[in-house]
Amino acid sequence: MCTLFVEKGTFTKTTNATAGINQIVTLANATLTPKVLWLWSCATTTANAYAENFVQSYGFSDGTTDYCTMIQSQDNQGTMIVQTGCYATGVIAFATIGTTTTRALADVFSFSAGRFELNWAISDTTPDIIHYMVMGGTDITNVKV
C-alpha cells in the first residue's frame, strides 16, 4: 500500500544566539518521517503585524541538500535599501534590516519520525515566526533539491 503524508505548521525560531545550536521541531504526526521540507517566513515576531520593512525567506530540503532565498527591503527611507541572497547551505535565512549582514541561517541537521531538526549556523535572539510543510510516505521517492 502506498502512502503520502503532509503536515503544515508554525514554530518560533530559537532565541539562543549560540552559533551551531540545534532546534528540534516536533510534528503533530509522530509517525511522519519527512522526505521533503519547505520553510517560509516574513521574519516577524507577531502574526499579522504591519511593518514598513519587508523581509521574506523561503527554503527547501530533502534532508541532505538545502537551498533557500532571502530578500529584505527597507522602505520609508531617503533611499530604499534592498538586499537579496541565495544560500546553497541553508534552508532558511534572515538579514539584519538595513544592512547586508545575515543575522540567522539554518540548515537541516536531520529528519526522523515525528520531527525535523535544524542547525543554526548563525543565530540571534529574535523569535521569528517560521512556517513549515513536510511531506513523507512511501509514495515519495528520489527527492532532490
Summary of predicted features, one role per range:
Residues 1-145:
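Surface-exposed molecular-recognition determinants
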